[in-house]
Amino acid sequence: MERTLTDRITNKTWSIRQSGNQVYIASNGGKAKEKGFDEPEQAAKYVQKETWSRLKKGFVLHNPQAGAGQPVLHRYIGGGYTGFMPLAATQDTNTFFSSYVIGQFEKAEIYLMDDQGEKQTTCELPGKQLIFDMRYCAAQKILLLNADHQIAGLSLDNGEIERYTPMMPTSTLSVSGSSALWYDKSSLVVYDLRTNTVRYTRQVECEKYGGHSLQLCAVLSHDGRLMAYCTRTDEIVIVNMTTMQERTIAKDKNAMTSSMAFSPDDRWLFTQEQYGSWSLKCYDLNTMTGCRDWITPEIKSFAIHERRGLLAVYNYGKIQLFDLHTMKPTIAFEVEHVVKNCTLAFTKDYLVVYTDYGCVSLYALA
């Protein structure tokens, strides 16, 4: 393992390399200092600790030659409250959005970052608002925000914020092309961001899971032809957005559905469960039944790459990639600089990871 970090203000470099039980550290290309350990595991932990120390001081790791599963980028964006670690990426470029809470909830900052870790744009969301989720509509250059269960749109052209819904007791958010899906006044709404018109509404009643949490989760397919929503603990509804025909999938009552995503070919629907199994379920949309051959352990987050047909799943410090054409695992790798949780999003060439340590990273896919 070898890491080279750069302070972009002073142009100073710092590198660390592990070889078995030995660790070698050098600054600004100078002679390396050697440090020995009893076990390779101890040496690896020391490398992580020292690397993290430099990241917190403003150094950035950028290695575009990284192999599959290796970090292309590490950048520390802050040690305060990381909140829900929202990410939004466009799969046609390697830029992505992340958000960070400043101080004691004084404001939230939203960063548009490139694959070198440079902040191309910084936007402020004033007031004590917590961003739960973000979705980018590239067609209209609007970053949709779910802040405190209120949906708003941040225009990248003029920086103005438009509120689309009032603050609600629960929320959901999805984007496909110029269409956005959210919850407003007891109804699911599909809104055309290009024409500023409502395409579809469906009144729903959100059931309480366990008597404490409202069950609400909805998503559009990648091409916008399908919508899935879950407002009851025992079923998921699939809507054909052309014919408005509805079909129902029966699901286990012992888990709350917190997130959903269609496969790029609309063959599968993946659902992330909470409180029950905490697993990633997979449903066959041809038979409207669960896939018996699909089994994952407890997961914390997942993401799908539409162009490459990849699925990334995070649990217990590791990410597993799956090929959605074969439904088979490909590579697995450890996430660096994470405590328990992280969020995932795919750019064109990389997997973005935002950890609860406040570290934003890119990992190579091939």
Language-model-derived ranges and their functions:
Residues 114-117, 155-159, 193-196, 240-244, ...:
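Short loop/turn segments that connect beta-strands within beta-propeller blades
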Residues 95-96, 142-143, 180, 227, ...:
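Hydrophobic beta-strand positions that form the internal "hydrophobic ladder"
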